[in-house]
Amino acid sequence: TPINPSDIGLLFGAADMATARVSGTPARPVVTTQVPERAMKGMAARVGQSLPVGNEGAGTVVAAGASPAAQALLGKTVAVLGGAMYAQYRTIRADQCLVLPDGTTAAEGASCFVNPLTALGMVETMRREGHKALVHTAAASNLGQMLNRICLKDGIGLVNIVRKPEQAALLKAQGAQQVCDASAPSFLADLTESLVQTGATIAFDATGGGRLAGQILGCMEAALSRTATEYSRYGSTTHKQVYIYGGLDTGPTEIIRNFGFAWGMGGWLLFPFLQKIGPEAVQALKARVAAELKT
C-alpha cells in the first residue's frame, strides 16, 4: 500500500508534527501531536472520529463470496481503490477489484489507481470540456511524469511547468516537448510561447497558493491575443480554465485580472470526477491502467 499526499492529509490533518510524541507499546504504538488553535475550527468535526487511512492497495484474494464473479477472483492478484487499505485484510466488492496482469506483483500494482487515474482524468477532463492541450504544474512529480508519457503516446500538447533547472532536464530527457522553468527570468515569455505552440487553454495546478494560477491565465490570454483577428475590450472569447488540485503552497491564491472575462478557476479532485463520469467510463480508464501498468 502506498502513501499518497491525500493519505498524509488524512493521517495528520492540521497537526503540527514538530510536537509529535510516541507512547503506547511496540505492538500498539500511539503518536500524539498538537493542533494549532487557529486550525481547530476546521478540524472540529473530526474530533473523536475514527478515520481509516489508505486510498489504494493491492494483494492476493484469499476468500470470496458465493457469486461467480467473486469466486473467479480467488488466488488472483488484484488492485483495489476503496479506502481503509492500511490493513492486513480488506473486504471489498468484487466489481471494485482490478485483476492485475499475470506476473505483476502486489507491490507493482499497489499504486496503479490514484496517480494513473488522476493523470488520465486530467486528459479526460480536457477532452470533455473541449480543450485540445493542457498545462500541468509541479510537472516533475511522479504524477507529472505519468501525464507526460500519456500525452506523448496520445499526441496531446502538454506544457510542463517546473521550479528548477534539474527538473526541466529530467522531463526533457523523457521526451517532454514543452517545459517551462518558473525560476527562469524568462518564465512568463517562455510560458506564453509554449501556449502559442500547443494551444493549451486548460491547466491543472498542484501548487494552489501564490501567483502561478493567475500567471497561467494571463499567459493564456496573451497567447490567444497573438492570433486574434479583432480587438475586444473584454478580452478573448476563448474560455481559459485553471483547476487547482493540490496545495503545495498553502498561502492565498493571488490573481491579477489581466486575462479578460472568459475564464474560470476551481478545484478538481479525482473521486468526484470519477463519480461524475459514471461506471462505464471509469472502467475504461481502469482497463487502460491495467494494460499499461508497466509502461
What are these language model-derived features?
Residues 107-109:
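C-terminal boundary of histidine-terminating zinc-finger modules
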Residues 153-231:
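Adenosine-nucleotide cofactor-binding segment
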Residues 73, 102-105, 127-134:
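Short helix-loop-beta connector
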Residues 112-185:
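Mid-domain Rossmann-like dinucleotide-binding core that forms the NAD(H)/NADP(H) cofactor-binding site
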Residues 206-294:
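Glycine-rich phosphate-binding loop and adjacent beta-alpha segment
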Residues 82-94:
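A structural motif shared across PLP-dependent enzymes of the aminotransferase-like
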Residues 5-11:
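Cytochrome P450 core scaffold surrounding the K-helix E-X-X-R motif
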Residues 1-2, 14-82:
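Glycine-rich beta-strand-centered segment in the early N-terminal region that forms part
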